[in-house]
Regions:
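N-terminal capping/lid subdomain adjacent to the active-site entrance of alpha/beta enzymes
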Residues: 1-180, 185-187
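Catalytic cores of alpha/beta
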Residues: 188-192
């Protein structure tokens, strides 16, 4: 039989992070703990990360739903992906907690070179919204770290400044050297 509980934490950002909908200085997150009564010394842990104002599961009853899931973990264990479609962060937290438990609760639910510190996932270097100068510094740091693709969060600066930043990057780095991606995060209306 499984037992589950959760804890809420408020995480303070080291540096304010700009989004198209404002500046984040902190965020709330929840850690789910899942224990199998047959092995009570093993605790699977998963994180349910909520970005208020940005995520699909930013709803008023979020914590109430999480408490219900933890209280009734046996009812959810085999069908949580179907029952919790409106709560993707809870799905992620449960999936990670169950995988961690299956992996003897070593806090590496999906062992790999990445989780062992021997490699990294080379998808793209994420560039947070900031002043043009700070974004250029972030991009240079990502390129120095070996990234050939950067994804820029845009929408916090005025449109012309962001276009100018992209143009200046393209002048400095060819498309063969650097792939540019943008993430507007709802910065523009449908009409724009």
């Amino acid at each position: 039989m499984l037992h589950s509980s959760y804890s809420k934490y408020i995480l303070d950002f080291n540096k304010p992070s700009w989004t198209s909908r404002g500046v984040l200085i902190q965020k709330e997150t929840y850690f789910i703990r899942v224990v199998d009564a047959a092995k009570p010394f093993l605790v699977g842990i998963g994180e349910c990360s909520v970005f208020r104002g940005l995520g699909a599961d930013d709803v008023p009853d979020y914590e109430k739903k999480l408490a219900e899931v933890c209280w009734n973990i046996e009812e959810y264990k085999d069908c949580y992906k179907e029952k919790l479609k409106e709560y993707p962060s809870i799905i992620f937290g449960l999936e990670t907690a169950f995988a961690d438990l299956e992996n003897e609760a070593k806090m590496t639910p999906f062992p790999s070179d990445f989780t062992e510190g021997k490699g990294f996932i080379k998808i793209n270097g994420l560039i947070w919204m900031d002043s043009q100068e700070e974004m250029k510094k972030q991009i240079d740091a990502k390129i120095d770290a070996g990234f050939s693709c950067v994804k820029m969060k845009i929408g916090a600066l005025d449109f012309d400044s962001e276009v100018e930043l992209l143009r200046s990057l393209r002048k400095r780095y060819s498309k063969e050297k650097l792939q540019l991606r943008v993430d507007a995060n709802g910065a523009f209306s449908v009409d724009e």
